[in-house]
Amino acid sequence: MDRREFLAGVAAAPLALALGESSSVVAAQTKPATAKRMPIRQSVMASVWTGTKYSFEERCQILSKLGFKGVDLPSREQIPTLKKYGLAPAMMTGTGTSFQDGLIRKELHAKFEPAIRAGIDMCVEVGCPNLIALPGERRGMSREEGAENAAAILSKVKGYAEEKGINLCMEITNSKVVADQRTDQVFDRLEWGWDVCKRVNSPRMKIVYDMYHVQIMNGDIVRNMQDNLQYICHIHVAGVPSRQEIDDTQELNYRFIANAIADSGYDGFVAHEWRPGPGRDAVKSLEQCFAILNV
């Protein structure tokens, strides 16, 4: 696709209309009786641009034209460009934690605490609601000890997060798919995340509900979301099993899921974290996948 041709205008109406025909039926099946239906604010992770050569500014132009509202994990230097095109930082990093050495490493808490506080300040500065903190690898540690350690450090900073109005969020990952390189993560099942949230006991303690990982480890995507919405501040989507586009080449019905999200009253971002499939155009895929969630 010629980038100038695309940037001159995007014609997504026919696809949106085609998808819209069945939305009222799906909504009726998923809508809780007391929920206020919320429009879905869509964001993206950098993975959706795999194999492309667009500059960051060109990416922002494309996303803005398609109707996206945010970008996950931008650098602080990229924020002015985001805002130039009406996009928001949906989630930021900057806590000192990593997939290897995370919140459960008690010996690193003295390092993590000031970093998390600084990350909260950064989120306030750039206008981002969510700060991600990673639980890390077990390396022989029991899940119980991991939950205790994670809750301990998060409890030390929860007051500051509450004061500043910033969500602290942990992301679930799967431990089954070797190619995803996360086989030893302590937070590989929803129950562990809910447990930590309950221990911390703060309205600012949340999780990133990554539907790709949840489907692999827990399943029951919609019910788990609806039953634990108070602990969810951010959602990631990707096709299962390939982690590619969220269309009908994959096992999850994301149109149905999108209606369930909208009907639940969830008002956070839903971020695309898939990679374009072989031979597929990233921009066309973004357009199509945006339409699937645009309910």
What do these predicted regions represent?
Residues 58, 77-80, 84, 114, ...:
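Alpha-helical scaffolding segments of alpha/beta enzyme cores, especially the outer helices
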Residues 69-70, 88, 129, 167, ...:
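Residue-level detector of anion-binding/catalytic polar loops
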Residues 48-50, 75-77, 95-98, 137-139, ...:
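Active-site-proximal loop/turn and secondary-structure-junction residues that shape catalytic pockets
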Residues 84-90:
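Glycine-rich loop at the start of a catalytic domain that most often binds anionic cofactors/ligands
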Residues 2-65, 127-129, 187-209, 213-295:
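Histidine-acidic metal/acid-base catalytic patches
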Residues 58-78:
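Catalytic domains of carbohydrate-active enzymes, especially glycoside hydrolases
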Residues 9-19, 34, 101-206, 216:
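Active-site acidic/histidine proton-transfer and metal-coordination neighborhood
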